[in-house]
Amino acid sequence: AKTENKTVTVRQTASPIXXXK
């Protein structure tokens, strides 16, 4: 489940970076 957790963290981090694409 470590890989899934990392994917979720990256997705949440990319969300603000994208700025709401």
Curated annotation (Swiss-Prot):
Query: What sections of the sequence does the record tag as coiled-coil?
Result: none
One GO CC annotation: ribonucleoprotein complex
| Compositional bias annotation for Polar residues | 1-15
In the UniProt record, does the keyword Ribonucleoprotein occur?
yes
Q: Which parts of this chain are annotated as the region Disordered?
A: 1-21
For this UniProt record, the keywords arranged alphabetically read as follows: Ribonucleoprotein, Ribosomal protein
Task: Please state which protein family the record places this protein in.
Answer: Belongs to the universal ribosomal protein uL30 family.
The entry describes its oligomerization and partners as: Part of the 50S ribosomal subunit.
Protein's name in the database: Large ribosomal subunit protein uL30
Q: Which organism is it from?
A: Brevundimonas diminuta
